[in-house]
């Protein structure tokens, strides 16, 4: 199921003298079956944008269409249950939301909340824990005894246990060490392979390159570009300065080499790609 934002505007305190406009005239489609990265400088509206995906926020004007569900400003809270069953949200530092006595009990909470019988909730929780590579020996431990990376995976399992079609991740790799980041990106790839639509916010462009099929760029509350990683990261340097974004590491190195006289046919996205281009350049000298 694709997600369509149609003429979406959002203001905190809408209709008051203290209204604070955040999102402006958002018209964008998040394609089904892909991993979409939302990027942009701090304060560009990314978190506000994704909170419209499961009705934590509702458009001040316009609408968000997810399959047959239409989110508008006048939708009642009681009508959001079906949307939230379809759209799972994992917030930044989700381990702060862990609360139960054991890992398994924590992950069972969401499916029970959505009406699963206890036995079904336990099966769903165990399936989700396996999906994010949390070993069985940890299931009966307190989640607060785990490492940061393990806690992050348990929190993700809590969202996956109710089997949503859409997974939304706010800075999923924030605060993790390199090993934890690598494991997290592997989980994102696995979610796509399982047929999920994945949306994630990231400030790390190399993570975007590693897993995203589709990229949405936000700046000052609006969508200023969208496309494949190749399309986005081959825009000119002036544009990147305008939207206050960095290039991936390979792109940064490539620009430094260009300034030193190297001729590269395009801006590489991966360091391995850059190495190949330099080897080709050397062979033609």
UniProtKB/Swiss-Prot annotation:
Pfam families: ABC_tran. Residues 3-245 form the ABC transporter domain. Its EC number is 7.-.-.-. It comes from the Bacteria. ATP binds at residues 40-47. Keywords: ATP-binding, Cell membrane, Membrane, Nucleotide-binding, Translocase, Transport. One of its GO terms (cellular component) is ATP-binding cassette (ABC) transporter complex. The active site is at 171 (proton acceptor). SUPFAM superfamilies: P-loop containing nucleoside triphosphate hydrolases. InterPro entries: AAA+_ATPase (IPR003593), ABC_transporter-like_ATP-bd (IPR003439), ABC_transporter-like_CS (IPR017871), ABC_transpr_CbiO/EcfA_su (IPR015856), ECF_ABC_transporter_ATP-bd (IPR050095), EcfA2 (IPR030946), P-loop_NTPase (IPR027417). It is found in: Cell membrane. One of its GO terms (molecular function) is ATPase-coupled transmembrane transporter activity. It is a peripheral membrane protein. It is an enzyme of class 7 (translocase). NCBIfam families: ECF_ATPase_2. ATP-binding (A) component of a common energy-coupling factor (ECF) ABC-transporter complex. Unlike classic ABC transporters this ECF transporter provides the energy necessary to transport a number of different substrates including 5-formyltetrahydrofolate, pantothenate and riboflavin. Expression of the complex plus FolT in E.coli allows 5-formyltetrahydrofolate uptake; 5-formyltetrahydrofolate is not taken up in the absence of FolT or the EcfA1A2T complex. Belongs to the ABC transporter superfamily. Energy-coupling factor EcfA family. Forms a stable energy-coupling factor (ECF) transporter complex probably composed of 2 membrane-embedded substrate-binding proteins (S component), 2 ATP-binding proteins (A component) and 2 transmembrane proteins (T component). This complex interacts with a number of substrate-specific components, including FolT, PanT and RibU for 5-formyltetrahydrofolate, pantothenate and riboflavin respectively. This is Energy-coupling factor transporter ATP-binding protein EcfA2. It comes from Leuconostoc mesenteroides subsp. mesenteroides (strain ATCC 8293 / DSM 20343 / BCRC 11652 / CCM 1803 / JCM 6124 / NCDO 523 / NBRC 100496 / NCIMB 8023 / NCTC 12954 / NRRL B-1118 / 37Y). The gene is ecfA2.
